Amino acid sequence: PGQDFMRF
């Protein structure tokens, strides 16, 4: 959530 890094 907030970033697209490993679907967070």
From Swiss-Prot:
Q: In which tissues is it expressed?
A: Expressed in the CNS and thoracic perisympathetic organs (tPSO) but not in the ring gland, midgut or abdominal perisympathetic organs (aPSO) (at protein level).
* Localization terms from the record: Secreted
Lineage in the entry? Answer: Eukaryota, Metazoa, Ecdysozoa, Arthropoda, Hexapoda
What residues bear Phenylalanine amide in this entry?
8
Q: What does this protein do?
A: FMRFamides and FMRFamide-like peptides are neuropeptides.
Q: Which GO terms describe its cellular component?
A: extracellular region
Record keywords, A-Z = Amidation, Neuropeptide, Secreted
Q: What is this protein called?
A: FMRFamide-like neuropeptide PGQDFMRF-amide
Q: What's a single GO BP term from this record?
A: neuropeptide signaling pathway
